[in-house]
């Protein structure tokens, strides 16, 4: 049977599917209908010719072809021909150029250069790991995860690949998986402070999911303001004669009731305000240390994992 008819049928089938589920505008739908009619006329096939149907739809065929291109055979496999000296040298040059583009924050260019290096030497874990860092900078965390998987597959002892995998998974809010990869990174590089810090953050995020009513950086402002301990201590602070005297002086136009002779009003007011805040913090710590620890945990949880160490490309 003519494969051209099979291909035409697959395209017509795909276009019909887009008409049903594509969410297209009326103009786009009309254009697809015209395209379908043209294909049916040109190749003499219609959607009713089910004998022309392939085992897979066109999108499935495309997805499989794309996956096979992105995931070539195992670079460590026995059938893989090692790169020539010239290819290895060129791959290193491309990697170095990619590193320079990373420093210039030209992340798309870096992805392209690392990809070229991978084409020449797909058995080098560093190239995949570096491209993962570039993908993360572009917000393509799924791509970063895939490249880290490739790097780990090539070199299971490569700690940086586990660390970058943890960063990408954290960005995807997959904190349980991120914790596992950070632990593996620390197992391979136990003195790495970045891995330790990122592991702590991921563990906190895993234990305490961010509140949907939380404020900036997932700090639960709404919960804080509704906490009776916080309200009681805040009321005590606002009723403090020292704070009331300070605020009265500031409102009256710079009068410095708490200042010392010869000190500037602005400096003394600021110092007094800081002093009042410190007293409030001390009072909170003494009266409800568990609540203070809860606030501290929320602040730590609101931080994002650091990529400072990971930005150093090899």
Curated annotation (Swiss-Prot):
SUPFAM superfamilies from the xrefs? TPR-like
Q: List the record's Gene Ontology CC terms alphabetically.
A: cytosol; extrinsic component of synaptic vesicle membrane; membrane; nucleus; presynapse; TRC complex
Q: Where are the TPR repeats?
A: 91-124, 125-158, 159-192
Which residues does this entry mark as bearing Phosphoserine?
Answer: 84, 302, 306
Q: Does the keyword Transmembrane apply?
A: no
Give the start-end ranges of region Disordered.
Answer: 65-99, 249-268
Q: Where is the composition biased (Basic and acidic residues)?
A: 71-83, 90-99
Q: What does this protein do?
A: Co-chaperone that binds misfolded and hydrophobic patches-containing client proteins in the cytosol. Mediates their targeting to the endoplasmic reticulum but also regulates their sorting to the proteasome when targeting fails. Functions in tail-anchored/type II transmembrane proteins membrane insertion constituting with ASNA1 and the BAG6 complex a targeting module. Functions upstream of the BAG6 complex and ASNA1, binding more rapidly the transmembrane domain of newly synthesized proteins.
Assembly and oligomerization: Homodimer. Homooligomer. Interacts with DNAJC5 and DNAJC5B. Interacts (via TPR repeats) with HSP90AA1. Interacts (via Gln-rich region) with SLC2A1. Interacts with HSP90AB1. Interacts (via TPR repeats) with HSPA8/Hsc70; the interaction is direct. Interacts with BAG6 (via ubiquitin-like domain); interaction prevents interaction between BAG6 and RNF126. Forms a multiprotein complex, at least composed of DNAJB12, DNAJB14, HSPA8/Hsc70 and SGTA; interaction with DNAJB14 and HSPA8/Hsc70 is direct.
Q: What is this protein called?
A: Small glutamine-rich tetratricopeptide repeat-containing protein alpha
In which organism is this protein found?
Rattus norvegicus
Gene designation = Sgta
């Amino acid at each position: 049977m003519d494969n051209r008819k099979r291909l035409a049928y697959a395209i017509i089938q795909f276009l019909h599917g887009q008409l049903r589920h594509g969410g297209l505008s009326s103009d786009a739908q009309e254009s697809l209908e015209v395209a379908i009619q043209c294909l049916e006329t040109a190749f003499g096939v219609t959607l009713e010719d089910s004998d022309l149907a392939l085992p897979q739809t066109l999108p499935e065929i495309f997805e499989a072809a794309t996956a096979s291109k992105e995931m070539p055979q195992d670079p460590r496999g026995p059938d893989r021909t090692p790169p020539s000296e010239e290819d290895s040298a060129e791959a290193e040059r491309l990697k170095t150029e990619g590193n320079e583009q990373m420093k210039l924050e030209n992340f798309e260019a870096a992805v392209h250069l690392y990809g070229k290096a991978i084409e020449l030497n797909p058995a080098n874990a560093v190239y995949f790991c570096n491209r993962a860092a570039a993908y993360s900078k572009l917000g393509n965390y799924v791509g970063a995860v895939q490249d880290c998987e490739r790097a780990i597959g090539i070199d299971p002892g490569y700690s940086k690949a586990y660390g970058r995998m943890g960063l990408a998974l954290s960005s995807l809010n997959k904190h349980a998986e991120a914790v596992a990869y950070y632990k593996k990174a620390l197992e391979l590089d136990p003195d790495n402070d970045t891995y330790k810090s990122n592991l702590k953050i991921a563990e906190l995020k895993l234990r305490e999911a961010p509140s949907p009513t939380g404020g900036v950086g997932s700090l639960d402002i709404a919960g804080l303001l509704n906490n009776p301990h916080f309200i009681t201590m805040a009321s005590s602070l606002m009723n403090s004669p020292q704070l009331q005297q300070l605020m009265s002086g500031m409102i009256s136009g710079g009068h410095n009731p708490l200042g010392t002779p010869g000190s500037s009003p602005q400096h003394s007011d600021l110092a007094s305000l800081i002093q009042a805040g410190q007293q409030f913090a001390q009072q909170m710590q003494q009266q409800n240390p568990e609540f203070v620890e809860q606030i501290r945990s929320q602040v730590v949880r609101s931080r994002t994992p650091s990529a400072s160490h990971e930005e150093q490309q090899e």
